[in-house]
């Protein structure tokens, strides 16, 4: 590989790493191309990206950036998953993919510059995703006005029942 090609790969990796709050280093040794393609598709669906890269190029690209804590841990065959939208969704996609593949392993990762081992990444994958949290927050915010409207409607209904009872009482007398 020419020096200019290496520089281009390093710049591309650096751009991905700087834009991504999460980076996860995986082992893909012995995986067929079809399985890697399925992994890439699954990650794209969850807002991520998967790159197979030489260890030295990854070390250079990650040095001095958000995921600097990863640079000293690269060994053997590595692939790096970057997630730019929802870190939890990327972690979930990787953990789910690992369940279906005997050759795929999650080694370690970085979330906003904090080193995460595979057990911490498993715990991250169990958290609710961004969309789920937004839905819960909106549901909670929507509950207050809904409850107010129901309370007000009940007050009006009870007031009307009281007026109707008074009217019936006067008509009977």
Curated annotation (Swiss-Prot):
UniProt keywords, alphabetically: Ribonucleoprotein, Ribosomal protein, RNA-binding, rRNA-binding
GO CC terms: ribonucleoprotein complex; ribosome
GO biological process: translation
InterPro entries for this protein: Ribosomal_uL10 (IPR001790), Ribosomal_uL10-like_sf (IPR043141), Ribosomal_uL10_bac (IPR022973), Ribosomal_uL10_bac_type (IPR047865)
Entry's Gene Ontology molecular function annotations: large ribosomal subunit rRNA binding
UniProt entry tagged with the keyword Ribonucleoprotein: yes
CDD domains: Ribosomal_L10
Family statement: Belongs to the universal ribosomal protein uL10 family.
PANTHER family to which the protein is assigned, alphabetical: 39S RIBOSOMAL PROTEIN L10, MITOCHONDRIAL (PTHR11560)
Xref: HAMAP family: Ribosomal_uL10 (MF_00362)
Record protein name field: Large ribosomal subunit protein uL10
Lineage: Bacteria, Pseudomonadati, Thermodesulfobacteriota, Desulfovibrionia, Desulfovibrionales
Gene giving rise to this polypeptide: rplJ
